[in-house]
């Protein structure tokens, strides 16, 4: 079935519109005269709303500030105009960096460097950048003559702490401001915890607090950004949210049903398209017809999908003798290829569309996009909100198109297909986004892998530290406050067993032989896991890299950089794969973990099934999916029933998030029942409904399960970078807090029993 014509996406309330805590002020008047002159030279008639609101509290320098606004709303200048004023007003002659700006991506740093260069040159303020692609000579000059503004990634700041530990205090002694760019990208992540720890250690080193400024996309819950900016909340923080200015959002969700996957069986024609390719053609046609002639971003959830879609759209252009307008963009493409795509997007006179993963989700400067498209269910509400923010700049509406495909209903489809769960989850996320809700970070995460990295880094920086002082730095006053003293001691013992740390005669913790090797390896500075990657080479040119965690062999086909390749040779020692152009191809199976779905999303799905209204942004195809899903939901009486018999399996419907489902699954596993999660339900193998009802009643009577008991039944526990150094006891502790939610799982069962 094809979608209805694209038409004009429906207008809905703006999900990013908000008001500021601090009212508008004559901020321009309080800027330094040289900064005012620079503003005049830019030809600005007025400061933008977010700049008016942010300048006074940043100039006050007596609090942290979170500046929240949509992409291209002027957040960078909102931070740097008052910071530049403060630097020009200073009388101190101490050498050192005065502003530290941390960004999650090298490309963002390069963008900011170009953007700030004119301002800094005009004001005679030094501007430095430090990341993996910056030359050693440029890095060296910054260390020899530190001053002004330093733009840096968390990994390069980590390297600076390790390699220049004795110089850190002098390099940052005059520091008067810390900027965290794209703050929302750090919330709840390993890198976010790493950054919190690094900034805490930096303030301990220079022995004073430094005002922090977080620049973030529009937030559903601003308090999340406050806690991400400074972990302890012991300093006041002002939230500055830009006025939405009446901006509208145009939104359309297109629904598709794939063609019968069995209709081509028995065909012997070599020219016949494989079923998985034919099934995507309707979405490809919709994209091609709608997006041609302008600049857009199309987000797909996997790099393999990106390659397939980019390849199909490129071939459509070739078939119609048109210049190509569609290019892939993902993290495993080479820097040169990614920069070529970004440059094409910036060209206003030439249409260009990037098919991308989350690589273009953050604020890399690519100019104004006419619209954003999402293929399939978005990974989270937060990601959808951020992706929406990439369109609708400079007063024009934000335009979002979503394309969701469900399977044709045959006698063999699962209940997930009958209920159209992919579609309903997408609608639930859109509705929550429109209500300005976003996922909070998972609570109770210990981040033990990151703690291992930070402890080793601190030992490299200082040369050694007493155990009680390390506990104070990281757990008592630092961001790892969820770890008790006894478990911290266990962590030290675990690291000592692996020869990572040892103690001097006076008890001082120092790096041991293996610890020295780990810290000195170039991969140490990243807190997250970095899989083994191979370079992809054709005719001597590097196309990009591929994380290889699946079998490969010469003669195998790949899709990469939007083109089809055949593997000629695999050089294991050199970590290289030699390719030649080919007519066939399958997408490489890039690795990557899916997002966890929050309780609120599943509860919104349940409410949608039971409702009668039709969201105004659904096209005819999407409305059909809505009707089909609701019809089957009511036929199965799932508004009341939670257990269904399907052959030898029992389906348990909970309508809760993944943490609750994981908890219930391993609670059942602990009782000897094989249980598997499938979207918002659990499949219990070789069971009958009456015996499951009895077991769940016993669970409710017993009370919430013990999370450490559940953790012992998890087979794969070493999922993060430094987990191999930790004992089973600490891994179980990490799992108990990270994966399970016993109280919510028990309450969900109790409500099920009561209904």
What is each of the regions a protein language model found here?
Residues 258-261, 515-522, 585-588, 689-694:
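Short, charged/polar, Gly/Pro-enriched secondary-structure boundary elements
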Residues 22-27, 59-60, 70-73, 80-158, ...:
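Helicase motor core with emphasis on the C-terminal RecA-like subdomain
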Residues 2-6, 11-16, 20-21:
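Interdomain "pre-motor" coupling segment immediately N-terminal to P-loop NTPase/helicase cores
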Residues 397, 415, 419-426, 432-444, ...:
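C-terminal effector modules of nucleic-acid-centric enzymes and ribosome-associated factors
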Residues 502-521, 576-583, 681-682:
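Accessory beta->alpha helical hairpin/"wing" motif in late/C-terminal subdomains of nucleic-acid enzymes
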Residues 21-68:
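Conserved pre-motif I regulatory segment
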């Amino acid at each position: 079935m094809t979608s209805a014509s694209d038409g004009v996406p429906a207008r809905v309330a703006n999900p990013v519109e908000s008001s500021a805590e601090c009212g508008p002020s004559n901020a321009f008047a309080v800027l330094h005269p040289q900064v005012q002159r620079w503003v005049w030279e830019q030809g600005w008639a007025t400061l933008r709303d977010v700049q008016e609101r942010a300048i006074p509290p940043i100039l006050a320098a007596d609090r942290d500030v979170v500046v929240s606004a949509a992409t291209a709303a002027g957040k960078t200048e909102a931070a740097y105009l008052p910071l530049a004023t403060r630097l020009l007003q200073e009388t101190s002659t101490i050498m050192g960096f005065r502003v530290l700006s941390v960004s999650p991506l090298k490309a963002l740093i390069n963008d900011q460097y170009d953007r700030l260069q004119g301002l800094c040159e005009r004001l005679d303020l030094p501007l430095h950048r430090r990341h993996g692609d910056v030359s050693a000579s440029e890095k060296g000059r910054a260390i020899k003559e530190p001053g002004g503004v330093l733009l840096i990634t968390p990994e390069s700041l980590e390297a600076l702490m390790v390699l220049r530990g004795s110089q850190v205090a002098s390099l940052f002694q005059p520091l008067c401001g810390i900027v965290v760019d794209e703050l929302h990208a750090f919330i709840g992540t390993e890198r976010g915890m790493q950054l919190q720890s690094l900034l805490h250690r930096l303030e301990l080193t220079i022995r004073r607090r430094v005002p922090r400024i977080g620049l973030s996309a529009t937030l559903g819950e601003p308090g999340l950004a406050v806690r991400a900016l400074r972990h302890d909340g012991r300093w006041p923080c002002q939230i500055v949210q830009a006025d939405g200015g009446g901006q509208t959002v145009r939104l359309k969700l297109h629904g598709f049903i794939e063609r019968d996957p069995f209709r081509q069986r028995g065909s012997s024609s070599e020219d016949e398209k494989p079923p998985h390719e034919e099934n995507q053609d309707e979405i490809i046609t919709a994209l091609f017809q709608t997006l041609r002639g302008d600049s857009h971003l199309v987000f797909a959830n996997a790099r393999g999908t990106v390659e397939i879609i980019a390849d199909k759209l490129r071939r459509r252009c070739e078939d119609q003798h048109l210049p190509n307008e569609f290019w892939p963009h993902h993290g495993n493409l080479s820097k040169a290829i990614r920069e070529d795509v970004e440059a094409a997007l910036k060209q206003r006179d030439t249409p260009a569309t990037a098919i991308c993963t989350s690589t273009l989700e953050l604020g890399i400067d690519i100019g104004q996009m006419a619209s954003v498209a999402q293929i399939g269910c978005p990974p989270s509400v937060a990601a959808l909100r951020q992706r929406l923010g990439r369109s609708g700049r400079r007063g024009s509406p934000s335009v979002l198109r979503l394309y969701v495909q469900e399977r044709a209903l045959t006698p063999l489809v699962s209940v997930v297909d009958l209920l159209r769960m992919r579609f309903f989850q997408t609608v639930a996320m859109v509705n929550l986004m429109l209500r300005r809700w976003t996922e909070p970070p998972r609570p109770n995460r210990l981040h033990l892998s990151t703690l291992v990295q930070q402890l080793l880094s601190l030992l490299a920086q200082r040369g050694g530290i007493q155990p009680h002082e390390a506990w104070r730095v990281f757990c008592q006053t630092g961001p790892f406050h969820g770890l008790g003293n006894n478990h911290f001691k266990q962590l030290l013992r675990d690291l000592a067993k692996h020869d990572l740390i040892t103690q001097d005669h006076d008890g001082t913790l120092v790096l041991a032989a293996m610890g020295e090797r780990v810290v000195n390896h170039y991969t140490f500075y990243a807190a997250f896991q970095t899989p083994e990657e191979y370079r992809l080479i054709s005719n001597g040119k590097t196309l990009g890299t591929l994380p290889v965690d699946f079998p490969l062999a010469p003669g195998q086909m790949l899709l990469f950089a939007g083109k089809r390749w055949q593997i000629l040779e695999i050089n294991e020692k050199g970590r290289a794969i030699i390719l030649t152009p080919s007519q066939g191809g399958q997408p490489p199976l890039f690795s990557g973990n899916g997002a966890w779905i929050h309780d609120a999303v599943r509860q919104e799905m349940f409410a949608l099934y039971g409702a009668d209204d039709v969201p105004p942004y659904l096209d005819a195809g999407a409305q059909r999916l809505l009707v089909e899903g609701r019809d089957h939901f009511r036929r199965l009486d799932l508004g009341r029933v939670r257990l269904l018999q399907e052959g030898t399996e029992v389906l348990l419907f909970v309508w809760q998030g993944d943490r609750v489902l994981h908890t219930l699954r391993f609670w059942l596993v602990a009782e000897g029942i094989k249980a598997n999660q499938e979207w918002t339900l659990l499949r219990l193998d070789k069971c009958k409904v009456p015996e499951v009802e009895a077991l769940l009643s016993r669970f409710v009577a017993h009370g919430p399960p013990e999370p450490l008991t559940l953790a012992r039944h998890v087979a794969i526990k070493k999922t993060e970078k430094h987990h191999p150094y930790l004992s089973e006891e600490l891994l179980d502790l990490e799992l108990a807090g990270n994966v399970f939610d016993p109280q919510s799982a028990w309450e969900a069962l109790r409500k099920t029993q009561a209904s």
